Amino acid sequence: MISCSFIFSPAEYDAEFLELDAKIESFAAALVGFVGVDRWVSDDGKSRNSIYYFDAMDSVRELSRYPEHLVAKANYRKWYLGYQIVVSEVVGSYGDGFFQHPSQINKD
């Protein structure tokens, strides 16, 4: 499993951003291999993290080539003060079974 953390500081969102964001979210969720997404906001609201989970890197590559994603990436300065992407291989995930999370790969 692959996780892609999109860590960012938001600026102002406009109608163009909201439309692109909705299209990108819909495309990502429809990809073969999409597992889920997890989102976090810092206590002060200045930092956010959207973590997307996929079965394989092929899905990540497909998302990265999506035309609307490329438009958003080219115009990111309009909507973000800064960002960092962290792509990781999830080698394990565990819990007590009472908290559902996209990274639960050990489901037995």
Stretches found by the model and what they are:
Residues 1-48, 58-65, 81-108:
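Short S/T/G/P-rich N-terminal loop/turn motif that feeds into the first structured element of a domain
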Residues 75-78:
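Arginine/glycine-rich "motif VI" loop of SF2 helicases in the C-terminal RecA-like domain
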